[in-house]
């Protein structure tokens, strides 16, 4: 019997393997292929598999040893689905409607420069909330991100929702440029770690590793060795130093 693999490299998607909401570059695909020859490689994203595939390619579940969509609530190993969890089943329809109705009313009364469409996206394991609306253009995304850094639209909204729905035991996690994720406590990216029990050392790479960011919980977990990256280029640089540079 082969010895169990000791180390795995686990990556966030947006801002880590790709620029925010952009497709992966050929350079990164080639780099991941080379890295996978040295260590098992996994990806964990807040988006569903469709959106992850749009960024990392249609063969993503075969290009990595593990793919965790929706923070690991939908899990794939060696190209096959191994588990799926449902937010609807956990919360129930009445609680979901209460949360969604309040959130839409809050956004309707929000005074921001522009609004587009798809303010709430219901996923299998989470709700994604975007004050500007997810179908805005890339230029509008960039502008909202700058505006939000000054006006704190998302963090203010999260504070209101956290107070209003504290009894729902929800976690609110700001990620990307225009939105934040809402999911049951414990259903953050650390959820994916239950599928990596065979590994002694889990190196996690992410860009939103600050408290409140959607990489924070897994970055800070005692189960992982956390690495903060600033771009896909920085990810490749750090991985080269850690995994691909021969130590004397």
Curated annotation (Swiss-Prot):
> Broadest EC class?
isomerase
Q: Where in the cell is it found?
A: Cytoplasm
**Protein EC:** 5.4.2.8
Q: Provide the binding site for Mg(2+) 2.
A: 219, 224
Lineage: superkingdom: Eukaryota
Where do the catalytic residues lie? Answer: 12 (nucleophile), 14 (proton donor/acceptor)
Query: What are the alphabetically sorted keywords of the record?
Result: Cytoplasm, Isomerase, Magnesium, Metal-binding
Q: Which cofactors, if any, are listed as required?
A: Mg(2+)
Any Pfam family the entry gives: PMM
Q: Which reaction does it catalyse?
A: alpha-D-mannose 1-phosphate = D-mannose 6-phosphate
Among the GO molecular function terms of this UniProt record, one is: phosphomannomutase activity
Q: Where does alpha-D-mannose 1-phosphate bind?
A: 21, 123, 134, 141, 179, 181
The metabolic or biological pathway listed in the UniProt record of this protein is:
Nucleotide-sugar biosynthesis; GDP-alpha-D-mannose biosynthesis; alpha-D-mannose 1-phosphate from D-fructose 6-phosphate: step 2/2
- Give the binding site residues for Mg(2+) 1: 12, 14, 207
A biological process (GO) of this protein is: mannose metabolic process
- GO CC aspect terms: cytosol
* CDD domains referenced in this protein's UniProt entry, alphabetically: HAD_PMM (cd02585)
Q: Which family does it belong to?
A: Belongs to the eukaryotic PMM family.
Quaternary assembly: Homodimer.
Please give the function described in this protein's UniProt entry: Catalyzes the interconversion of mannose-6-phosphate to mannose-1-phosphate, the precursor for the synthesis of GDP-mannose. GDP-mannose is an essential sugar nucleotide for the synthesis of D-mannose-containing cell wall polysaccharides (galactomannans and glucomannans), glycolipids, glycoproteins and the antioxidant L-ascorbate.
- What name goes with this protein? Phosphomannomutase
What is the species of this protein? Answer: Spinacia oleracea (Spinach)
């Amino acid at each position: 019997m082969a010895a169990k693999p000791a180390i795995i490299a686990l990556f966030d998607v947006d801002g880590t393997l790709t620029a925010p909401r952009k497709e992966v570059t050929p350079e990164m695909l080639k780099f991941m292929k080379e890295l996978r020859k040295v260590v098992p490689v996994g990806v964990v994203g807040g988006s569903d598999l469709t959106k992850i595939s749009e960024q990392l390619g249609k063969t993503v579940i075969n290009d990595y040893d593990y793919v965790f969509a929706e923070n690991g609530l939908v899990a794939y190993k060696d190209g096959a689905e191994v588990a799926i969890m449902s937010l609807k089943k956990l919360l129930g329809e009445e609680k979901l409607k209460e949360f969604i109705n309040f959130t839409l009313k809050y956004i309707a009364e929000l005074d921001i420069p522009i609004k587009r469409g798809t303010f709430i996206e219901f996923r299998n394991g989470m709700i994604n909330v975007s004050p500007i609306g997810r179908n805005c253009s890339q230029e509008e995304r960039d502008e909202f991100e700058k505006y939000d850094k000054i006006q704190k639209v998302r963090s203010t909204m999260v504070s209101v929702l956290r107070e209003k729905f504290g009894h729902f035991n929800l976690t609110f996690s700001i990620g990307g440029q225009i939105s934040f994720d809402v999911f049951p406590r414990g259903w953050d990216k650390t959820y994916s770690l239950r599928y990596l029990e065979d590994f002694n050392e889990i190196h996690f790479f992410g860009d939103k590793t600050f408290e409140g960011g959607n990489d924070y919980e897994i970055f800070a977990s005692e189960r992982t060795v956390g690495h903060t990256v600033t771009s896909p280029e920085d990810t490749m640089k750090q991985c080269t130093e850690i995994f691909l540079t021969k130590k004397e």
